[in-house]
Amino acid sequence: MRTYALVVLLLAQLTTASQNCSLTLSGKVIDLHDGSLLSGATLVVSETETIVQTSLDGVYSIPNLCPNTSYSIKVLHSSCTPKTFSLKISGDSVRDFKLEHHLEELNEIILEGKAYENKTTTVLEKNLNQETLEQYSAGTLGDALNSLSGVSSLNKGNGIVKPIINGLHSSRIIMINNGVRMQDQEWGKEHAPNIDVNSVGRLTLVKSASALQYGGDAMGGIIIAEGPKVAIKDSLYGKTMLFGASNGRGGGITSQLTKSFENGIYGTAQGTFKRFGDVEAADYVMSNTGLYEKDMSLRIGLNRFNYGIEGYYSYFNTDIGILRSSHAHGAADQIRAIESDIPLTIREFTYDIGYPKQNVTHQLSRIKAFKNLGDYTLEIQYDYQLNRRFEYDIRVGNDRDKPALDLKLDTHTILIDLNGSFEDLNFKSGIMGRFQTNFANPETGIRRLIPDYDKYDFGLYTVLDKKINDKFEIETGVRFDYSYMDVFKFYKNSIWEERGYDILFPDLVIEEFSNQVLVNPELEFKNLSATLGFNYKIDDNNTLFINHALSSRAPNPAELFSDGLHHSIARIEVGDLRFKSEVGNKTSLTYSHVGKTFNFSINPFVNNIRDFIVIEPVEIRETIRGNFQVWEYRQTDAQLLGVDIDASFSINEKINLNHQLSIVKGYDNTLNEPLINMPPVNTKNEISYQNKKLQNLKISLQSEYVFAQNEFPNNNFEVYLPITETYEEVDISSTPDAYHLLNLNASMDFKTSKKSSLSVGLGINNLLNTSYRNYLNLLRFYSDDMGRNFLLNLKLNY
């Protein structure tokens, strides 16, 4: 028996010795939620003590494994929760391991796939992180976006800053707020985005319509505001910021608190309060330009390994005064205001916000969920938005405190998306349904600018990106959108006949009155959008992006139906019921170099838009309320082209140089003349110093030079002056002179305890108190822009 046992043991040893332990286990380490590759992951084989790491492409290979043997493999990554996998192999095998980012938050998982991932692969995106955004706590989202090349803004006083991307704005830009496309009467040039900059963790700018998951009508681009990331671990943290400004003699406070648990439950509460009085130009007070703002947001959710759900709510409310001198109702007063070097009305500084003014409230509610289905992720979202806009004119008598414009916009949206990947192919596909209703309150006693309407939208998209090899990646996508509008509108008989609608659309009339008709247009728009592009990695430092985007945009309600006085900008606007969808073809090329000391990117583009809708001044019209400029919408074929350049150079580890240059030109190909309101050439140069050993001291000096816009259409017209019984030309076409501004910023960080720190920031905008006027400021006819402004920021992290 003893001899038998020895023989068996010997045979077993011989079998083991002869066993082929040369098998290989290979595969990828990928993110659970979106299949993105995780480079730098470590795999430890417990039985053999073998340790390997994934490559830049997330690929691993474990050699010298034995057949029919069980192994325990621990997979670790710096941004993920470690996980151990058990498996047995019988031959060379391929196995992918999935990890979950412990810094993932549901907000990014659902729509973007993972925290702060690229929204498109063939367009170079620009980003602003939370540290940069905090410098604009006293300002607006538009102020922050202005720091990016290719972005400028339409301004109207303090707090109304509307982004322009490569020359386009309003309905041609998509604004995404925490996964929700904003619906906030964005058609108005003086309707700023209703988003609190202090609620944003990161801003992403896509200067193209290539990110089709958000919409196909982003001819200018897409701005994506994302909330701060939430760590999936037991923690409680927050921040409170106090900010103040000398110009406007005001300030505010913003605070945010986040609680998270290791089981995936988390919640965040955030709020902001701002109060500013009249701002001042270099030499005088800009009367009635105060601001009063109250914002808050709440977020609560559950983020588990393969499913999650989140609820989000935000409230935005602002009162914004509009420069008193901009509302000059008489023809002679308008000419005098335009020709004067100073505003016609200059009063003592005050915090009171009188008329004219805007009061806007925007509420957003959203619930979304995701479920991981292996190689796919299913995402469902519902959101509701309520926008209330009141615009007040200077009225007398019993109507003094009654708004001249009272709009209520309700929007319901459902999104269903499916994301997945097959080896080197990633896809996104989804459908969208939206119902919107607009109510223009007739109790204002003034003819409604835009009518009541119900609007139905349906969208369907698919986007694919394929990695051909280590250097070449291609992206393509297509989207179809259908819109239906059911509108009820009153037209004066004279307007209905003057525009030829009585001949073109006689069937639209449902009721006739003595001096007006009630019509019921039912409009349909079918739009196709697409994108095709690629990026080519020349080497580790140089990348080339090429993208062509076909975008289609249905006319917005203002462009179709405007027929009255727009009180916020004191002008009559006239739309056209005959408008068709705009169709844009934008080709952009970007070369990017990222090195140790020198970074550079250049982005030329050309955008040809068929049936481009433009609004221009045509005359001054006398009404019972005074004389007002008349601006009419019309369609034409247009071309926009330009280039954006960014460069930075590190002289040493403490001193850096930064440069930006943006050029955009716009032309009306039908009339062979420049387009109105195109941003002038501008350039920014900055030198910055940072000493991490000296309380992280940062000092920067920025030079901003804006050239005069020398290409503009001639929209001047003559007006009759009854007092002198003469005609005089109104020059509203000439552009302001070039100007140069200096801005200084400094900050330091102090450790106040083991778990808290204090950051102190000081800034001076318009350091030399320069008097200037910006071509894109709607108040440039009546006043200079803001003078010197001292800014103080105190931030406590805890």
What is each model feature region?
Residues K402-D417, G459, V574-S581, K586, ...:
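Outer membrane beta-barrel strand-and-loop segments of large Gram-negative receptors
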Residues V94-K98, L141-A144, V161-I164, I176, ...:
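N-terminal periplasmic accessory domains that precede
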Residues I30, A41-V44, K74-C80, S90-E134, ...:
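Short, acidic, small-residue-rich periplasmic hinge/interaction motif at the N-terminus
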Residues S199-G201, L212-D283, N288-M296, R304-Y307, ...:
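Outer-membrane beta-barrel translocator/receptor signature
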